[in-house]
Amino acid sequence: MSDNETYRDAALRGLDYTLGRNALAQSYVRGYGTKVPQNVHSRLYAHQLDDTVPRAPPGSMAGGANENASDPPADDVLQGCAPQTCYVDDVNSYSTNEVAINWGSALAWVVNWAATQ
């Protein structure tokens, strides 16, 4: 990435945050940690809405805390929340709990890179 350790350290802190070193002690990656997303927003893995549909597989990453959350479940629960605590594990919370390939692929790259550090 860079010979500058400032960038290395920042990337590792970001990964730590994603994996649970945050205000909620919440891992945003399914299958890693003890407090993980159960009800990610996904058209493929909407288990909360239909228990015949599987949960998202391990390695799926939810979007995470978002102080500008803008969906009905977040609006109902997160009014006035402190930054980094604005998260709701609900299948309909697309602003905090959606899985997407753009951040899932970045997670795969960062985890692979971090393993070499």
Language-model segments: residues:
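Aromatic (Trp/Tyr) and acidic
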Residues: M1-Q117
